């Protein structure tokens, strides 16, 4: 029986997601043995700087992709929102299982709702996407960046000068946190999720047909369509961690509705549109074209240039 080496980051969430997917493969009868190899990524090592200041997408995947190239591992389970829109040559997404909750979770001291936070309240997030959208609704809030895994951030809420923090609902749910810890889930209308938020992407070598055949059995077609549309939009916009960019699609199997957002980091400018269609790639590109005509692409390039100059 072939032994499959699975690459994973060392965080509790990453290992939980990896082991969950391995168990799904076993339940589906995949004819493999499995071993997990833990890999430290650049994003795991840099904890004292905002991610937007140390590079774009890929901070949590490059070392893992290198291990795939060198055949140290056979596949990796990623939080898909961490994956660059364009994969390196020779690597593919072999499976996207059903999506978990794509929303953002708002967690505050004393369970004070977002709309009831006092002026000047401090909200912790490491995401430019979240901060820009929060400031659009509540420009009177103070955004303070926060890094670390889920447990670390929840601890910081209790011990440091934060009135609230924002986390991905999917991570909380996968780790088994009770919904009691969440003050409220932010609607996608108020806080559009990151591209592919809540989805897992299983990355492997494109020539590993034996493995790809088994991975394909666990793909959820609706989630695949949604992720494809969102990632096509991200790729066309040349977006990354340096710019607030969001994309969220829903598919009923025939029709895909895709909403995209690009904003200035200080929320002074926000571009947001929705398109509907049946072809995931086409509507992702169509949405990018619409926002580009409005000025979103120029904004992205300008913000990137400013970041690179610092």
Curated annotation (Swiss-Prot):
Give residue numbers for the modification (S-(dipyrrolylmethanemethyl)cysteine). 241
State which Enzyme Commission number(s) the record gives. 2.5.1.61
Q: Which cysteines are joined by disulfide bonds?
A: none
Name the keywords, alphabetized.
Porphyrin biosynthesis, Transferase
Could you mention a single GO BP entry for this protein?
Answer: protoporphyrinogen IX biosynthetic process
* Signal peptide per UniProt: none
Report the cofactors: dipyrromethane
Q: Does the keyword DNA-binding apply?
A: no
The lineage's top-level taxon is Bacteria
Q: Which PROSITE patterns match?
A: PORPHOBILINOGEN_DEAM
State the reactions this protein catalyses.
4 porphobilinogen + H2O = hydroxymethylbilane + 4 NH4(+)
Give the Pfam families listed for this entry. Porphobil_deam, Porphobil_deamC
Q: GO CC annotations?
A: cytoplasm
Instruction: Supply one GO molecular-function term.
Output: hydroxymethylbilane synthase activity
Cited InterPro entries: HemC (IPR000860), Porphobilin_deaminase_cofac_BS (IPR022419), Porphobilin_deaminase_N (IPR022417), Porphobilinogen_deaminase_C (IPR022418), Porphobilinogen_deaminase_C_sf (IPR036803)
Top EC class for this record: transferase
The miscellaneous comment for this protein is: The porphobilinogen subunits are added to the dipyrromethane group.
Family of the protein in this entry: Belongs to the HMBS family.
What function does the entry list? Tetrapolymerization of the monopyrrole PBG into the hydroxymethylbilane pre-uroporphyrinogen in several discrete steps.
Listed HAMAP family: Porphobil_deam
Tell me what this protein is called. Porphobilinogen deaminase
Species the sequence originates in: Lysinibacillus sphaericus (strain C3-41)
Q: What is the lineage of its organism?
A: Bacteria, Bacillati, Bacillota, Bacilli, Bacillales
């Amino acid at each position: 029986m072939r032994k499959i080496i699975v690459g994973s980051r060392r965080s509790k969430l990453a290992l939980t997601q990896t082991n969950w997917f391995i168990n799904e493969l076993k339940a589906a009868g995949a004819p493999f043995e499995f071993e997990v190899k833990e890999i430290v990524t650049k994003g795991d090592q840099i904890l004292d700087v905002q991610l937007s200041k140390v590079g774009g997408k890929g901070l949590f995947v490059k070392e893992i992709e290198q291990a795939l190239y060198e055949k140290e591992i056979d596949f990796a389970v990623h939080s898909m929102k961490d994956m660059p829109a364009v994969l390196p040559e020779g690597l593919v997404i072999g499976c996207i299982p059903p999506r978990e909750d794509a929303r953002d979770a708002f967690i505050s001291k004393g369970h004070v709702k977002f709309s009831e936070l006092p002026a000047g309240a401090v909200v912790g997030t490491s995401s430019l996407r979240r901060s820009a959208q929060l400031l659009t609704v509540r420009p009177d809030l103070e955004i303070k960046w926060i890094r670390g895994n889920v447990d670390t951030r929840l601890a910081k809420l209790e011990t440091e000068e934060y009135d609230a923090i924002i986390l991905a609902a999917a991570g909380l749910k996968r780790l088994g946190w009770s919904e009691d810890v969440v003050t409220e889930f932010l609607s996608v209308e108020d806080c559009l999720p990151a591209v592919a938020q809540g989805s897992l992407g299983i990355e492997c070598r494109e020539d590993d047909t034996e493995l790809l055949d088994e991975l394909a059995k666990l793909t959820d077609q609706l989630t695949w369509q949604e992720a494809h549309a969102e990632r096509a939009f991200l790729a066309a916009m040349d977006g990354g961690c340096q710019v607030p960019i969001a994309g969220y699609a829903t598919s009923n199997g025939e029709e895909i509705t895709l909403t995209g957002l690009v904003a200035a980091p200080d929320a002074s400018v926000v571009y947001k549109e929705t398109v509907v269609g049946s072809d995931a790639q086409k509507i992702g590109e169509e949405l990018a074209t619409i926002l580009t005509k409005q000025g979103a692409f120029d904004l992205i390039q300008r913000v990137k240039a400013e970041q690179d100059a610092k």
